[in-house]
C-alpha cells in the first residue's frame, strides 16, 4: 500500500518535459558561439576544413556582415529580416543561427531559417535547385516491347 501512494501523487502532477540540448560533435551551442574560428574548424569535416584553410573571400564575409546588421536592427524577440544571397556554397557557422536567409536556387529565393542542426552544412543543401521528377506513364519507344504496340 505504501508503494502505491507515491505513484498516485506523481501521476497527479504533470511531468516536466525535458528537451534535448543541442551539441555539435560533443560541444554545446554556447561553447560553439564563444569558440574561435581556428578551434571551430577543427570540429568540421575534412572538406570544410580544406575550404576554411584556403581562406574566406570577400563575398562570404559580406553576407555575414549583412546578417549581423539584420540581427542588430531586429526588435527584441522578433525574427530578423531575410537577407538574400546567391552564395549557395556558403558554410553555415554558429554565428548565423537564428538568421533568415533567402538562398537563390536559380529561379527564386527560398527562405531558410538557420537552426543549430545546420552547422557545418552548405546553404545549397536547404534550397533545392531542381524539381524532383514525377514519373508518368512511359511513352512509345520507352521499352523494346513497346515498339510493337500500334499507334492510336
From Swiss-Prot:
Spell out the InterPro entries in the cross-references: Ribosomal_uS19, Ribosomal_uS19_CS, Ribosomal_uS19_euk/arc, Ribosomal_uS19_SF
Q: Which GO terms describe its biological process?
A: translation
In Gene Ontology terms, what is one molecular function of this protein? Answer: mRNA binding
Q: Where in the cell is it found?
A: Cytoplasm
Q: Which GO terms describe its cellular component?
A: cytosolic ribosome; cytosolic small ribosomal subunit; nucleolus; plant-type vacuole; plasma membrane; plasmodesma
Q: What is its main location?
A: cytoplasm
Question: Which keywords annotate this record?
Answer: Cytoplasm, Ribonucleoprotein, Ribosomal protein
PANTHER family registered for this protein in UniProt = RIBOSOMAL PROTEIN S19P FAMILY MEMBER, SMALL RIBOSOMAL SUBUNIT PROTEIN US19U-RELATED
Family assignment from sequence similarity: Belongs to the universal ribosomal protein uS19 family.
**Protein name in the entry:** Small ribosomal subunit protein uS19x
Provenance organism: Arabidopsis thaliana
Identify the gene encoding this protein: RPS15D
Amino acid at each position: 500500500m505504501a508503494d502505491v501512494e507515491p505513484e498516485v501523487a506523481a501521476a497527479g502532477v504533470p511531468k516536466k518535459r525535458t528537451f534535448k540540448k543541442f551539441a555539435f560533435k560533443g560541444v554545446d551551442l554556447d561553447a560553439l558561439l564563444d569558440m574561435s574560428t581556428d578551434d571551430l574548424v577543427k570540429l568540421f569535416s575534412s572538406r570544410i576544413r580544406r575550404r576554411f584553410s584556403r581562406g574566406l573571400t570577400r563575398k562570404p564575409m559580406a553576407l555575414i556582415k549583412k546578417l549581423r546588421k539584420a540581427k542588430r536592427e531586429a526588435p527584441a524577440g522578433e525574427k530578423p529580416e531575410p537577407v538574400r544571397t546567391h552564395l549557395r556554397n556558403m558554410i553555415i557557422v554558429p554565428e548565423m543561427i537564428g538568421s533568415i536567409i533567402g538562398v537563390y536556387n536559380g529561379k527564386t529565393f527560398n527562405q531558410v531559417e538557420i537552426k543549430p542542426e545546420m552547422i557545418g552544412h552548405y546553404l545549397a543543401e536547404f534550397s533545392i535547385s531542381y524539381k524532383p521528377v514525377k514519373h508518368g506513364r512511359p511513352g512509345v519507344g520507352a521499352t523494346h516491347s513497346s515498339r510493337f504496340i500500334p499507334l492510336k
